[in-house]
């Protein structure tokens, strides 16, 4: 909770290596949050860090397709998603008989937007999901209990594959963005 000028916000604090602090004020509030919190800016928080451009969304905003999409359109390589109550499935949608991570929304959003998703749940599955769901083995770290997830995320524009050939990084190329009709959600 962030308090400014007598107003309360559901917020995430981002502390950077240089000591600076940045706050993301959640813009898509639940009914319960709307009883005490102000809605934040829909533009979201985007930070240019040495490891890649990072976009922050909070809690249930992972359920809203457009929020991660707008961050990806702003060039984010990584989606940072702290504090979701139930990450596997939005309310009202039945769970499926798959491994619990298979349809995990952080995994789906990372794939839809060609980004990484670093995801912390209050309960359930947390982890870091890579941009390609079809890569085997998957480029991800999944935690089903308390712990620390650590993974190398390659956000370079071009790198070499096993044969030494240059490859454009999926996270930077963002091929999925080229198929979108942005007139529906551009301001």
Where do the protein language model's features map onto the residues?
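CN hydrolase (nitrilase-like) catalytic-core segments centered on the catalytic cysteine
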Residues: 63-148
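Active-site mouth loops of central-metabolism enzymes
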Residues: 56-62
